[in-house]
Amino acid sequence: MRPIDAARRLKLSTSALRNYEAQGIIPPALRDPNGYRKYTEEHLAYLECIAAMASGYGMEVTSDVMRLLRARDTASALWLVNEAQALLHRDRCLAEEAICRFDLEERGASDPESEGMTIGEAAAETGVPRSTLRYWEKEGLIASSRDEQNGYRRFSPPQLRKIWLLRTLRTVLYSADSVRLKQAIRKLEDNDAERARDIALEALHYLNRLNQEQLRGSYYLFRLCRRLNLLQ
Protein backbone atom coordinates (compact mmCIF):
# COMPACT_ATOMS: atom_id res chain seq x y z
CA MET A 1 0.00 0.00 0.00
CA ARG A 2 1.26 3.47 -0.88
CA PRO A 3 1.81 5.87 2.05
CA ILE A 4 -0.78 8.25 0.57
CA ASP A 5 -3.39 5.47 0.61
CA ALA A 6 -2.56 4.57 4.21
CA ALA A 7 -2.75 8.24 5.19
CA ARG A 8 -6.17 8.64 3.60
CA ARG A 9 -7.46 5.46 5.20
CA LEU A 10 -6.42 6.62 8.67
CA LYS A 11 -7.14 10.33 8.08
CA LEU A 12 -3.51 11.28 8.61
CA SER A 13 -1.01 13.27 6.60
CA THR A 14 1.89 11.58 4.86
CA SER A 15 4.22 13.81 6.89
CA ALA A 16 2.70 12.33 10.07
CA LEU A 17 3.54 8.86 8.78
CA ARG A 18 7.13 9.91 8.10
CA ASN A 19 7.33 11.40 11.59
CA TYR A 20 6.10 8.13 13.08
CA GLU A 21 8.89 6.33 11.24
CA ALA A 22 11.48 8.88 12.38
CA GLN A 23 10.30 8.51 15.99
CA GLY A 24 10.61 4.74 15.78
CA ILE A 25 6.99 4.02 16.65
CA ILE A 26 6.26 2.18 13.38
CA PRO A 27 8.64 0.08 11.27
CA PRO A 28 10.42 1.81 8.37
CA ALA A 29 8.56 1.72 5.09
CA LEU A 30 9.56 -0.95 2.60
CA ARG A 31 10.73 -0.13 -0.93
CA ASP A 32 9.26 -1.56 -4.09
CA PRO A 33 11.49 -2.40 -7.12
CA ASN A 34 11.15 1.19 -8.32
CA GLY A 35 12.30 2.59 -4.99
CA TYR A 36 8.91 3.88 -3.90
CA ARG A 37 7.96 3.59 -0.25
CA LYS A 38 5.17 1.16 0.63
CA TYR A 39 3.36 -0.08 3.73
CA THR A 40 2.30 -3.61 4.60
CA GLU A 41 -0.60 -4.92 6.67
CA GLU A 42 1.77 -4.89 9.64
CA HIS A 43 2.30 -1.15 9.19
CA LEU A 44 -1.46 -0.65 9.09
CA ALA A 45 -1.85 -2.63 12.31
CA TYR A 46 0.65 -0.32 14.00
CA LEU A 47 -1.06 2.78 12.66
CA GLU A 48 -4.55 1.62 13.64
CA CYS A 49 -3.31 0.80 17.13
CA ILE A 50 -1.69 4.23 17.50
CA ALA A 51 -4.88 5.98 16.41
CA ALA A 52 -7.00 3.92 18.81
CA MET A 53 -4.67 4.22 21.81
CA ALA A 54 -3.86 7.92 21.52
CA SER A 55 -7.35 9.10 22.48
CA GLY A 56 -7.35 7.15 25.73
CA TYR A 57 -3.70 6.91 26.68
CA GLY A 58 -2.18 9.95 24.97
CA MET A 59 0.62 10.00 22.41
CA GLU A 60 3.44 9.86 24.95
CA VAL A 61 2.33 6.55 26.46
CA THR A 62 1.25 5.22 23.06
CA SER A 63 4.63 6.03 21.51
CA ASP A 64 6.51 4.38 24.37
CA VAL A 65 4.36 1.27 24.03
CA MET A 66 4.97 1.07 20.27
CA ARG A 67 8.74 1.33 20.74
CA LEU A 68 8.66 -1.45 23.34
CA LEU A 69 6.65 -3.65 21.00
CA ARG A 70 9.12 -3.04 18.21
CA ALA A 71 11.85 -4.15 20.64
CA ARG A 72 9.65 -7.18 21.41
CA ASP A 73 9.54 -6.20 25.09
CA THR A 74 5.88 -7.11 25.49
CA ALA A 75 5.96 -7.32 29.28
CA SER A 76 7.21 -3.75 29.72
CA ALA A 77 4.71 -2.47 27.15
CA LEU A 78 1.75 -4.08 28.90
CA TRP A 79 2.85 -2.89 32.33
CA LEU A 80 3.11 0.64 30.96
CA VAL A 81 -0.49 0.38 29.78
CA ASN A 82 -1.49 -1.03 33.17
CA GLU A 83 0.14 1.95 34.90
CA ALA A 84 -1.86 4.39 32.77
CA GLN A 85 -5.06 2.52 33.62
CA ALA A 86 -4.19 2.68 37.33
CA LEU A 87 -3.71 6.45 37.10
CA LEU A 88 -7.12 6.83 35.49
CA HIS A 89 -8.68 4.72 38.26
CA ARG A 90 -7.01 6.97 40.83
CA ASP A 91 -8.44 10.05 39.13
CA ARG A 92 -11.90 8.49 39.25
CA CYS A 93 -11.50 7.93 43.00
CA LEU A 94 -10.45 11.57 43.41
CA ALA A 95 -13.55 12.74 41.54
CA GLU A 96 -15.78 10.60 43.72
CA GLU A 97 -14.04 11.92 46.84
CA ALA A 98 -14.65 15.50 45.70
CA ILE A 99 -18.34 14.77 45.16
CA CYS A 100 -18.61 13.27 48.66
CA ARG A 101 -16.92 16.33 50.17
CA PHE A 102 -19.29 18.70 48.39
CA ASP A 103 -22.26 16.60 49.53
CA LEU A 104 -21.06 16.85 53.15
CA GLU A 105 -20.64 20.59 52.77
CA GLU A 106 -24.16 20.93 51.38
CA ARG A 107 -25.54 18.99 54.36
CA GLY A 108 -23.63 21.22 56.76
CA ALA A 109 -21.23 18.51 57.89
CA SER A 110 -18.26 20.76 57.08
CA ASP A 111 -17.64 24.37 57.99
CA PRO A 112 -17.76 26.57 54.88
CA GLU A 113 -17.15 29.65 57.04
CA SER A 114 -13.74 28.50 58.32
CA GLU A 115 -10.74 30.74 57.81
CA GLY A 116 -9.33 28.48 55.14
CA MET A 117 -5.84 27.01 54.99
CA THR A 118 -2.28 28.08 54.42
CA ILE A 119 -0.57 26.76 51.32
CA GLY A 120 1.17 24.11 53.42
CA GLU A 121 -2.10 23.03 55.02
CA ALA A 122 -3.86 22.95 51.65
CA ALA A 123 -1.05 20.86 50.16
CA ALA A 124 -1.19 18.41 53.06
CA GLU A 125 -4.99 18.18 52.97
CA THR A 126 -5.37 17.71 49.21
CA GLY A 127 -2.11 15.96 48.34
CA VAL A 128 -1.33 18.61 45.73
CA PRO A 129 2.29 19.88 45.88
CA ARG A 130 2.86 23.49 46.87
CA SER A 131 4.57 24.13 43.54
CA THR A 132 1.41 23.02 41.72
CA LEU A 133 -0.78 25.26 43.88
CA ARG A 134 1.50 28.22 43.09
CA TYR A 135 1.34 27.37 39.39
CA TRP A 136 -2.46 27.17 39.44
CA GLU A 137 -2.59 30.53 41.19
CA LYS A 138 -0.22 32.03 38.63
CA GLU A 139 -2.49 30.72 35.86
CA GLY A 140 -5.54 32.29 37.52
CA LEU A 141 -7.27 28.98 38.27
CA ILE A 142 -7.27 29.65 42.03
CA ALA A 143 -6.65 32.71 44.19
CA SER A 144 -5.34 33.25 47.69
CA SER A 145 -5.52 36.08 50.19
CA ARG A 146 -2.75 37.17 52.55
CA ASP A 147 -2.87 36.75 56.31
CA GLU A 148 -2.80 40.24 57.81
CA GLN A 149 -0.56 39.14 60.67
CA ASN A 150 2.13 37.11 58.92
CA GLY A 151 1.56 37.67 55.21
CA TYR A 152 1.16 33.97 54.45
CA ARG A 153 -1.10 32.79 51.65
CA ARG A 154 -4.50 31.55 52.76
CA PHE A 155 -6.95 29.64 50.61
CA SER A 156 -10.60 30.16 51.50
CA PRO A 157 -13.09 27.25 51.53
CA PRO A 158 -14.39 28.20 48.04
CA GLN A 159 -10.81 28.17 46.73
CA LEU A 160 -10.25 24.80 48.38
CA ARG A 161 -13.24 23.52 46.38
CA LYS A 162 -11.42 24.56 43.23
CA ILE A 163 -8.28 22.78 44.38
CA TRP A 164 -10.24 19.56 44.95
CA LEU A 165 -11.69 19.86 41.46
CA LEU A 166 -8.39 20.65 39.78
CA ARG A 167 -6.77 17.74 41.59
CA THR A 168 -9.21 15.44 39.80
CA LEU A 169 -7.97 16.67 36.41
CA ARG A 170 -4.32 17.07 37.29
CA THR A 171 -3.01 14.11 35.27
CA VAL A 172 -5.69 13.72 32.59
CA LEU A 173 -4.90 14.06 28.91
CA TYR A 174 -4.97 17.48 27.30
CA SER A 175 -8.21 17.68 25.34
CA ALA A 176 -11.05 20.05 24.54
CA ASP A 177 -13.07 18.49 27.37
CA SER A 178 -10.32 18.88 29.96
CA VAL A 179 -9.76 22.50 28.92
CA ARG A 180 -13.50 23.19 29.16
CA LEU A 181 -13.66 21.70 32.66
CA LYS A 182 -10.69 23.75 33.84
CA GLN A 183 -12.25 26.91 32.46
CA ALA A 184 -15.47 26.06 34.33
CA ILE A 185 -13.43 25.73 37.53
CA ARG A 186 -11.72 29.06 36.86
CA LYS A 187 -15.11 30.79 36.53
CA LEU A 188 -16.68 29.04 39.54
CA GLU A 189 -18.31 31.55 41.89
CA ASP A 190 -17.33 31.40 45.55
CA ASN A 191 -20.88 30.85 46.78
CA ASP A 192 -21.88 28.28 44.15
CA ALA A 193 -21.25 24.96 45.92
CA GLU A 194 -23.92 23.29 43.78
CA ARG A 195 -22.05 24.20 40.59
CA ALA A 196 -18.84 22.81 42.11
CA ARG A 197 -20.57 19.47 42.59
CA ASP A 198 -21.89 19.57 39.01
CA ILE A 199 -18.36 20.13 37.70
CA ALA A 200 -17.13 17.18 39.75
CA LEU A 201 -19.84 15.03 38.16
CA GLU A 202 -18.86 16.27 34.69
CA ALA A 203 -15.25 15.37 35.46
CA LEU A 204 -16.37 11.89 36.53
CA HIS A 205 -18.32 11.44 33.28
CA TYR A 206 -15.25 12.58 31.33
CA LEU A 207 -13.10 10.00 33.12
CA ASN A 208 -15.69 7.33 32.33
CA ARG A 209 -15.40 8.21 28.64
CA LEU A 210 -11.61 8.01 28.86
CA ASN A 211 -11.98 4.57 30.40
CA GLN A 212 -13.97 3.47 27.35
CA GLU A 213 -11.34 4.97 25.04
CA GLN A 214 -8.66 3.04 26.90
CA LEU A 215 -10.65 -0.16 26.46
CA ARG A 216 -10.87 0.47 22.73
CA GLY A 217 -7.14 1.19 22.57
CA SER A 218 -6.39 -1.98 24.52
CA TYR A 219 -8.38 -4.01 21.99
CA TYR A 220 -6.29 -2.67 19.12
CA LEU A 221 -3.15 -3.26 21.16
CA PHE A 222 -4.16 -6.89 21.64
CA ARG A 223 -4.74 -7.23 17.88
CA LEU A 224 -1.32 -5.78 17.13
CA CYS A 225 0.42 -8.03 19.67
CA ARG A 226 -1.29 -11.05 18.19
CA ARG A 227 -0.29 -10.07 14.65
CA LEU A 228 3.32 -9.67 15.79
CA ASN A 229 3.23 -13.04 17.60
CA LEU A 230 4.09 -11.35 20.89
CA LEU A 231 1.55 -13.18 23.04
CA GLN A 232 2.14 -16.59 24.57
Positions of the model-derived regions?
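Arg/Lys-rich, alpha-helical DNA-contact motif
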Residues: 1-10, 22-116, 157-232
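Short alpha-helical "recognition helix" segments of helix-turn-helix
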Residues: 6-7, 20, 122-124, 136
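Major-groove DNA-recognition helix of helix-turn-helix-type DNA-binding domains
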Residues: 17-33, 130-149
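Amphipathic alpha-helical protein-protein interaction segments
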Residues: 116, 124-127, 139
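Phosphate-backbone recognition surface of nucleic-acid-processing proteins
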Residues: 139, 151, 158-161
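Long amphipathic alpha-helical coiled-coil segments
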Residues: 143, 147-155, 227-231
